[in-house]
Amino acid sequence: MKRQTLALIGLLIVASLFPISEKVEVKVSVKHPVVVQTKATMEQKRANKKMADTFARVGFGWDKRQRACVHLIFTKESRYDHLAKNQQGSSAYGIAQMLGEKSTDPATQILRAFHYIEQRYGTPCAAWRHHRKGWY
């Protein structure tokens, strides 16, 4: 990878970690076309699944049964694709297809989904029971 590309990637990572509220003009000269990723790769999906399982086990203390329910929900919603867009036309986005989700960061999406599940349903399996009826 060329230095300019690496520098641009570094700039984008820093900008996503430290958002600013004022407008900043950035001029970038790109000689090669920029490829915008619209779907997660299988490798990314596997990493997202592993991250979700780790967060559920370590961060939330959910047992194997609860983690299986997380897997059912995330598989049905997006197959762990953090770039998934809702096929029904709503603004739902990401791994858990949450409304209003703006982050493309899988860790942020997973944590927001887990907090939502915990606050609204108590456990992932309670969320899954509700989800089977349609929405969650």
Language-model features: where?
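Peptidoglycan cell-wall recognition and remodeling modules
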Residues: 45-136
